[in-house]
Swiss-Prot record:
This is Ig heavy chain V region E1. Residues 1-19 form the signal peptide. Coiled coil: none annotated. Gene3D superfamilies: Immunoglobulins (2.60.40.10). Residues 69-85 are annotated as: Complementarity-determining-2. It holds the Pfam family V-set. Residues 50-54 are annotated as: Complementarity-determining-1. Residues 55-68 are annotated as: Framework-2. Disulfide bonds join C41-C115. GO terms for biological process: adaptive immune response.
């Protein structure tokens, strides 16, 4: 049974840039188990609709390169085990936005979420 005193730390990373390409995440917050949260990623400096985009989770104390990709977004996203049915990735090409909607949050969802191209 989950304790209501246990909080999940779901934070987007700081904006990063390669040349003029930027992906800026927003929406991070501290939530309790069972809550929902939406993260967004705004792209600029490239033609958003021409690229596969995805989310990567960095668990506390773990290196980013050891984390699991949630999905490269194509026509039909695929999800890592444990998040299917709770996490949904969507994109709005006209506004250059990628979203990650998370519901029924669990302690193992804790981490930093990075948007990647």
């Amino acid at each position: 049974m989950l304790s209501w005193g246990y909080f999940l730390f779901l934070l987007p990373t700081l904006p990063g840039a390669q040349s003029q390409v930027q992906l800026v995440e927003s929406g991070g917050d501290v939530r309790k188990p069972g809550d929902s949260l939406r993260l967004s990623c705004k792209g600029s400096g490239f033609t958003f609709s021409n690229y596969w985009l995805g989310w990567v989770r960095q668990a506390p104390g773990k290196a980013l390169n050891g984390s699991l990709p949630l999905t490269p977004l194509a026509a039909a996203p695929t999800y890592i085990p444990g998040v299917s049915g709770r996490f949904t990735i969507s994109r709005d090409n006209a506004r250059a936005l990628l979203h990650l909607d998370m519901s029924d949050l669990r302690p193992e969802d804790t981490g930093r979420y990075h948007c990647e191209r």
